[in-house]
């Protein structure tokens, strides 16, 4: 039976785990690849303490990010409606569509807070009127904003 060696990963490796995980690997894999290339460290009590401290800091930082997202969600709901002006043809149809970038600009103008347009889901909007867009502020926090498209 082959002996296994326990190492702590210093970076994420798809076949083993993510940074900070303790994994059991073959001694040759650890000695010839993981340790020389700095992808893992031998497990010692000091390394275990370091990993634990790092995980605590990450947990606190994740809690702060979630709280910021919840606060921003509340701010978006208090504003109520965002207005986007677009050019309209004679038949009342927009020239082009309202994109997630347009919604991001409207939110940034109203809140002075930058938001990534890739986190905004906008329905196909080709007419004037009121619509709802969904925003992913955090993996656990989503918000819905009302959009009014005017000419």
UniProtKB/Swiss-Prot annotation:
Keyword field contains Plastid: no
GO CC, alphabetical: ribonucleoprotein complex; ribosome
Biological process, per Gene Ontology: translation
Family annotation (Pfam families): Ribosomal_L9_C, Ribosomal_L9_N
Alphabetized Gene3D superfamilies for the sequence: Ribosomal protein L9, C-terminal domain, Ribosomal protein L9, N-terminal domain
The UniProt record lists the keyword RNA-binding: yes
InterPro entries: Ribosomal_bL9 (IPR000244), Ribosomal_bL9/RNase_H1_N (IPR009027), Ribosomal_bL9_bac/chp (IPR020594), Ribosomal_bL9_C (IPR020069), Ribosomal_bL9_C_sf (IPR036791), Ribosomal_bL9_N (IPR020070), Ribosomal_bL9_N_sf (IPR036935)
GO molecular function, one term: rRNA binding
Swiss-Prot/TrEMBL keywords: Ribonucleoprotein, Ribosomal protein, RNA-binding, rRNA-binding
Function, as annotated: Binds to the 23S rRNA.
Family as reported in the entry's similarity comment: Belongs to the bacterial ribosomal protein bL9 family.
NCBIfam families given in the database record: L9 (TIGR00158)
Name listed for the protein in its UniProt record: Large ribosomal subunit protein bL9
Organism listed in the record: Prochlorococcus marinus (strain AS9601)
Chain's gene name: rplI
């Amino acid at each position: 039976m082959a002996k296994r060696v326990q190492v702590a990963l210093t970076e994420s490796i798809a076949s083993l785990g993510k940074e900070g995980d303790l994994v059991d690997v073959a001694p040759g894999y650890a000695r010839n690849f993981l340790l020389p290339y700095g992808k893992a460290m031998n497990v010692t009590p000091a390394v275990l303490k370091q990993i634990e401290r790092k995980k605590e800091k990450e947990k606190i930082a994740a809690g702060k990010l979630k709280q910021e997202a919840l606060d921003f969600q509340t701010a978006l709901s208090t504003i109520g409606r965002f207005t986007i002006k677009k050019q309209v043809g004679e038949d009342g149809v927009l020239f082009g569509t309202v994109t997630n970038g347009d919604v991001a600009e409207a939110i940034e103008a109203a809140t002075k807070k930058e938001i990534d347009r890739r986190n905004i889901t906008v329905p196909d909007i080709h007419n004037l009127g009121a619509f709802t867009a969904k925003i992913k502020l955090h993996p656990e926090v989503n918000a819905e904003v009302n959009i009014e498209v005017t000419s």
